[in-house]
Amino acid sequence: MNDLINFEIVTPLGVIYQGEVKSVTLPGSEGEFGVLKGHAALVSSLKSGVIDIEKADLNHELIAIDAGHAKVDEDKICVLAKGAVWVCGSDESEIEKNLAQAKDLIKSMSSDNAALAATFSKLDNARMH
C-alpha cells in the first residue's frame, strides 16, 4: 500500500519543493498541524515558521517559510508561500548560511517573540541532528 502524499511548495519565484512524502507538519495560523495521505480536504492560512517534511526514507527536511496558505486534499498538499528557504546543504558552512537566511526570513515577517524563539529553536535543533 502506498502511504505517500504528493507535496509541493510554490513561491513567486517558482516551485521550491516537489515530491512524494510520508508526512508534512505545517505552521498553521492557529498552531502546527500534521498531514498524512488520506487527510480530510482543507484550506489553511500559514504563519511564518518551519515546514517539517518526512520523506519516504524517514529522513526529515526543513523549509522555512514566511506567511502563506496550504491546500490539502486526500493525496496532495500544495503550499503557496511568499518566500521560502530550504534549510539544508552539502557542508556545514552551507547549512549555517541557509539557517541564517531562514532566520532572517522569519524574523522579517513576525513580531511575536515567543513564536520566533520556538521557530529558531526548531531550526537549531534540526541542524544538530
From Swiss-Prot:
<dbReference type="Pfam" id="PF02823">
    <property type="entry name" value="ATP-synt_DE_N"/>
</dbReference>
<keyword id="KW-0813">Transport</keyword>
<keyword id="KW-1003">Cell membrane</keyword>
<keyword id="KW-0066">ATP synthesis</keyword>
<dbReference type="InterPro" id="IPR036771">
    <property type="entry name" value="ATPsynth_dsu/esu_N"/>
</dbReference>
<comment type="subunit">
    <text>F-type ATPases have 2 components, CF(1) - the catalytic core - and CF(0) - the membrane proton channel. CF(1) has five subunits: alpha(3), beta(3), gamma(1), delta(1), epsilon(1). CF(0) has three main subunits: a, b and c.</text>
</comment>
<keyword id="KW-0139">CF(1)</keyword>
<dbReference type="InterPro" id="IPR020546">
    <property type="entry name" value="ATP_synth_F1_dsu/esu_N"/>
</dbReference>
<keyword id="KW-0472">Membrane</keyword>
<keyword id="KW-0406">Ion transport</keyword>
<keyword id="KW-0997">Cell inner membrane</keyword>
<dbReference type="GO" id="GO:0005886">
    <property type="term" value="C:plasma membrane"/>
</dbReference>
<keyword id="KW-0375">Hydrogen ion transport</keyword>
<comment type="similarity">
    <text>Belongs to the ATPase epsilon chain family.</text>
</comment>
<dbReference type="InterPro" id="IPR001469">
    <property type="entry name" value="ATP_synth_F1_dsu/esu"/>
</dbReference>
<dbReference type="GO" id="GO:0045259">
    <property type="term" value="C:proton-transporting ATP synthase complex"/>
</dbReference>
<dbReference type="GO" id="GO:0046933">
    <property type="term" value="F:proton-transporting ATP synthase activity, rotational mechanism"/>
</dbReference>
<comment type="function">
    <text>Produces ATP from ADP in the presence of a proton gradient across the membrane.</text>
</comment>
<dbReference type="GO" id="GO:0005524">
    <property type="term" value="F:ATP binding"/>
</dbReference>
<protein>
    <recommendedName>
        <fullName>ATP synthase epsilon chain</fullName>
    </recommendedName>
</protein>
